[in-house]
From Swiss-Prot:
It comes from Escherichia coli (strain SMS-3-5 / SECEC). Pfam families: Glucokinase (PF02685). InterPro entries: ATPase_NBD, Bacterial_glucokinase, Glucokinase. One of its GO terms (cellular component) is cytosol. GO terms for biological process: glycolytic process. This is Glucokinase. Keywords: ATP-binding, Cytoplasm, Glycolysis, Kinase, Nucleotide-binding, Transferase. It comes from the Bacteria.
Length: 321
């Protein structure tokens, strides 16, 4: 008889839940719920389990916020809870809450070639560290290393490191954003809101008044080539994505590859392919040759958060991935 575990991927807007076959890692019965419709994560889980009429005693949920102890208060949502209390209330034997990019990183060993698009570099070196980052509502970052037949995710808040400009234009943008918001982290330019910040700064640098645009508006106008400012903002976004990814590669010598997740880049894939992303990734001065062969991949799997939550749980329960 198949034994299932509960897996989840919870963001500021939606909660995605699914079942994971503990033996094979296969994800099934995925369903998305609006977080606004439920008073708590526990309530969503109860509805899901009731709908699917399956006995589950183990679970792993990925959430888009730092996980530093038993109490979890979501960054972009009102939900807050004790992990131990929720485990007890649900009658689970094991329940773990992990950072969303811990989950994405743990999905990487489970991905197939059709789930990846490569942007330059050579083949990944087996056993070497891996980096993963992705722009969405924010900028998530994690690393992954392989130690004693186990994958170990190294989560953190790398999206909040300082934005490091490396051109005159980027320096001007930093000054404009610093005057507006104070500290300028990488996330302030590499995210949905970050794309808006880039657009606004480009326009203001020319002493003009920016329109009140959303990320979707900027992307659409850039792809239609109907707005020079929007096209410049999207081009610069791709370049800064490259610089940031190259920095991650240098930090840990990620010859196992650098992986891009998140919902933004797939929306303008052809534009991204033709952009200055890879040149910026390799623009490391004396260490250009060091990063030259490091491959970069875009993850195009539908649910890497669910896949990675399942992989993390299965490994915790003793399975070798």
């Amino acid at each position: 008889m198949t034994k299932y575990a509960l897996v989840g991927d919870v963001g500021g807007t939606n909660a995605r839940l699914a079942l994971c076959d503990i033996a094979s890692g296969e994800i099934s019965q995925a369903k998305t719920y609006s977080g606004l419709d439920y008073p708590s994560l526990e309530a969503v889980i109860r509805v899901y389990l009731e709908e699917h009429k399956v006995e589950v005693k183990d679970g792993c949920i990925a959430i888009a916020c730092p996980i530093t102890g038993d109490w979890v208060a979501m960054t972009n949502h009102t939900w807050a809870f004790s992990i131990a209390e929720m485990k007890k209330n649900l009658g689970f034997s094991y329940l773990e809450i992990i950072n969303d990019f811990t989950a994405v990183s743990m999905a990487i060993p489970m991905l197939k070639k059709e789930h990846l698009i490569q942007f330059g570099g050579a083949e990944p070196v087996e056993g070497k560290p891996i980096a993963v980052y992705g722009a969405g509502t924010g900028l998530g970052v994690a690393h992954l290393v392989h130690v004693d037949k186990r994958w170990v995710s190294l989560p953190g808040e790398g999206g909040h490191v300082d934005f490091a400009p490396n051109s005159e234009e980027e320096g001007i943008i930093l000054e404009i954003l610093r005057a507006e918001i104070g500290h300028v982290s990488a996330e302030r330019v590499l995210s949905g809101p970050g794309l808006v910040n880039l657009y606004r700064a480009i326009v203001k640098a020319d002493n003009r008044l920016p329109e009140n645009l959303k990320p979707k508006d900027i992307t659409e106008r850039a792809l239609a080539d109907s707005c020079t400012d929007c096209r410049r903002a999207l081009s610069l976004f791709c370049v800064i994505m490259g610089r940031f990814g190259g920095n991650l590669a240098l930090n840990l010598g990620t010859f196992g590859g650098v992986f891009i997740a998140g919902g933004i880049v797939p929306r303008f894939l052809e534009f991204f392919k033709a952009s200055g992303f890879r040149a910026a990734f390799e623009d490391k001065g004396r260490f250009k040759e060091y990063v030259h062969d490091i491959p970069v991949y875009l993850i195009v799997h539908d649910n890497p958060g669910l896949l990675g939550s399942g992989a993390h749980l299965r490994q915790t329960l003793g399975h070798i991935l």
